Amino acid sequence: MVAFIDAHREAYGVEPICAVVPIAPSVYYERKARERAPERRPARARRDEALTVEVERVWREHHAVYGVRKVWKQLRREGYAVARCTVGRLMRRLGLAGAVRGRAFTVTTVADSAVARPPDLVARQFTAMRPNQLWVADLTYVATWRGFVYVAFVIDVFSRRIVGWRVSSSLRSDLALDALEQALYARPGVAAAPLVHHSDRGVQYLSIRYTERLAEAGIERSVGSAGDSYDNAMAESVIGLFKTEVIRRRGPWRGVEDVEFATLAWVAWYNDDRLLEPLGYVPPAEFEQAYYDRQTAPDSVAVLN
């Protein structure tokens, strides 16, 4: 309305226009005065202007996947004293929204009934008291212009940190094995304490080479059923985030190189920056570091005393 009056005031005058539109001349003049002197604007308007910049920054810095709750949590972590309802109001004004997860489970497992299956040591209890106590592994596929691309993950249950991953244009046993090798490289000395590796009954995870590598590393095997998302729920959950936050939002994909680069960036962000609700809205790396800090704290106190 103010813009309309600005456009026609030279021809008709402010008061005559206000006589036929739903705005008083005093309101118009006050708004124009605030444009010339921003300090005259209400405190809420000035605060909204400053917060709007930060809300949009957080949303964009986190790959445009955060909804109201996580944008609010991130702002609070950064020291902004802001209410969740305020963040929601500003995001609606900006037209910002978080990623919405679709169907969480897609069957990618090809089971081999002829291969003996190790016992299920997890029984759907995806909990761990320390890092390197329980790893879960799974894979998914991505449709590209050049055919399907496959992505394998190895995840530490304690912090939900992705410790190994690999992208390939072939659903071969080496795909899962390469992800495992990356995890073992990232976590040297895992055999120092008992570690269980849990997967579904996919042929990649029951292959002789994969089985031998686990045994060589001193890792105990656990296998759920085939095609049952609940038997590998944590891996399915992380893969669901990957598909929602990367694959569906940034496609279509040209080929394996594009998927690999995007996965590299997402895994780094997920491990170091993404807030996870089950961890108390802290990133996996921070949650894990807090565990190690607690383990060393008594020794530090003893030295000081």
Model-identified regions with their sequence ranges:
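Charged DNA-binding/catalytic regions of mobile-element recombinases
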Residues: 1-305
